[in-house]
Amino acid sequence: MTKGDAFRLQRGDAQLTGRLHEQALNGPLRIEEHGRPQANLSYAGGLLHGLSQTFHPNGRLSAQLPYQNDRLEGVASFYSTEGQLLRSATYRKGLLQGEAVTYFPDGTVAERELYNNGVREGLLQRFHPNGKLALKAQYLNGQLLDPGQRYAEDGRPLNAAGKPVSRLKWWWTNGAEE
């Protein structure tokens, strides 16, 4: 192939289509199988660069991945086979950085966590499917600082035995719900 050549590779029902520049992948690269997209990748000088997408076997989007110089950079999003957002996470220089959020199939938040240079750092929150807080914990340098506080589906804290505190005690310390 010569400089800037487009190419198409076929093996059985799989097909790879892209472009080379000075013997390195450059520009969009498309992978298909059985006529359905498997991935749309973006290259610059042989490195992943730009927005790449992967697809589920049913053709729906599986992930959107922003790359810079072969490393994840920005918000990556991951989807179910039905198309619902399952997780979004921010990356910097290929490492998790900032907030990562995981979702239940109905779209409500299941978990929020914070990262610093790829290590869990700060507040971790997990939620019940009804949206109420299930767990609140703190991390420092990837280490859990304490067992955290767990909560029942109605919002009451759980005691050390895993039982919800009495409503009277909960209301007394937190104020009655209206």
Question: Which stretches of residues belong to each language-model region?
Answer:
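Periodic aromatic/glycine/histidine/acidic cluster detector
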Residues: M1-S80, Q84-Y103, T108-N116, R120-R126, ...
